[in-house]
């Protein structure tokens, strides 16, 4: 019996994992302050989707659920974000991206029912939904063939300008400056990987500048998040501890 005649069809690849959030502050060194569970599906046509559940324990606690999809060229297609803050509903929104436009339909505890439509420079290349697992996906925008060691990503839209992603969700435009550090071999709880090390060094357009953020993703074209460290006032560390 050929694959097409089989009653079942599994043409996609699936990766599941867990990321822990730890404090790097002197008085809380190594204390777990949150966690994230994610599932990534890579379809036969190159499209990919991530579903992530994120928990930040620091008061006021934040809980976030996202579903984010991209096409075969890593271009954003759609995203769903639901957040609660202090164990209370904050907002729920759906985002859609097409050539030249980004749209949002959302309901929030503060703003009520909101519809947004923004013009974009062609098809939006990346969207920040605040799931840590997605942070490494921005790194594909860096041109490693260029002599520039710090590059601007161009336009990016966020689901929230808050550093913890605890507002909205609604569209908010910024750009990001990324520095390429180099290739490394990285060992985390989930194993040892060939990695690319980058650093977010600027967030033009954000109301409050984000502290420098070192991030390591797999060096295999999938940019799977491995670990990250944020300096400044945040002093937090993220690590992939489980991978299935």
Region spans (language model):
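Acidic, serine/threonine-rich low-complexity disordered tracts
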Residues: 2-108, 155-244
């Amino acid at each position: 019996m050929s694959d097409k005649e089989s009653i079942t069809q599994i043409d996609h690849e699936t990766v599941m994992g867990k990321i822990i959030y730890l404090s790097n502050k002197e008085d809380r060194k190594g204390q777990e302050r949150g966690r994230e569970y994610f599932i990534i599906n890579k379809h036969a046509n190159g499209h990919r989707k991530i579903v992530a559940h994120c928990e930040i324990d620091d008061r006021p606690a934040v809980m976030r659920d996202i579903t984010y999809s991209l096409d075969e060229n890593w271009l954003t297609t759609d995203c769903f974000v639901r957040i609660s803050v202090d164990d209370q509903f904050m907002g729920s929104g759906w985002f859609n991206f097409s050539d030249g436009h980004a749209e949002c339909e959302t309901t929030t505890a503060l703003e009520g029912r909101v519809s947004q439509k923004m013009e974009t420079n062609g098809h939006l290349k990346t969207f920040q939904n605040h799931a840590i697992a997605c942070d490494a996906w921005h790194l594909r925008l860096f041109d490693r063939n260029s002599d520039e060691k710090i590059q601007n990503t161009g336009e990016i839209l966020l689901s929230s300008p808050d550093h913890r992603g605890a507002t909205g969700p609604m569209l908010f435009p910024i750009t990001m400056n990324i520095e390429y550090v180099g290739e490394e071999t990285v060992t985390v709880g989930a194993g040892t990987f060939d990695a690319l090390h980058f650093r977010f060094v600027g967030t033009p357009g954000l109301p409050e500048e984000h502290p420098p953020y070192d991030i390591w993703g797999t060096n295999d074209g999938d940019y799977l998040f491995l670990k990250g460290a944020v300096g400044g006032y945040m002093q937090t560390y993220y690590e992939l501890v489980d991978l299935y």
